[in-house]
């Protein structure tokens, strides 16, 4: 998995599935962010459901939005 320069990776739990492959994710610290699925996960048809544990990559510029890069089994 390629790491993005300056991106913050944090674990969270999917709370709600939204339209257009967006998800509301509650992070370990209690904050909720809006996240979309990374392209590799979309390409390999990895499904994400509510209550899944995921790793979210946050940009240092906007900490309210992120990208889901991994789903725990």
From Swiss-Prot:
Name used for this protein in its record: Translation initiation factor IF-1
Function per UniProt: One of the essential components for the initiation of protein synthesis. Stabilizes the binding of IF-2 and IF-3 on the 30S subunit to which N-formylmethionyl-tRNA(fMet) subsequently binds. Helps modulate mRNA selection, yielding the 30S pre-initiation complex (PIC). Upon addition of the 50S ribosomal subunit IF-1, IF-2 and IF-3 are released leaving the mature 70S translation initiation complex.
PANTHER family named in the record: TRANSLATION INITIATION FACTOR IF-1, CHLOROPLASTIC (PTHR33370:SF1)
Top-rank taxon: Bacteria
Compartments, record wording: Cytoplasm
Family membership: Belongs to the IF-1 family.
GO molecular function, one term: rRNA binding
InterPro entries for this protein: NA-bd_OB-fold, RNA-binding_domain_S1_IF1, S1_domain, TIF_IF1
Subunit structure, as described in the record: Component of the 30S ribosomal translation pre-initiation complex which assembles on the 30S ribosome in the order IF-2 and IF-3, IF-1 and N-formylmethionyl-tRNA(fMet); mRNA recruitment can occur at any time during PIC assembly.
Gene3D superfamilies tied to this protein: Nucleic acid-binding proteins
Keyword Transcription among record annotations: no
Keyword Transmembrane tagged: no
S1-like domain sequence ranges: 1-73
Record key words, sorted: Cytoplasm, Initiation factor, Protein biosynthesis, RNA-binding, rRNA-binding
A cellular-component GO term for this protein: cytosol
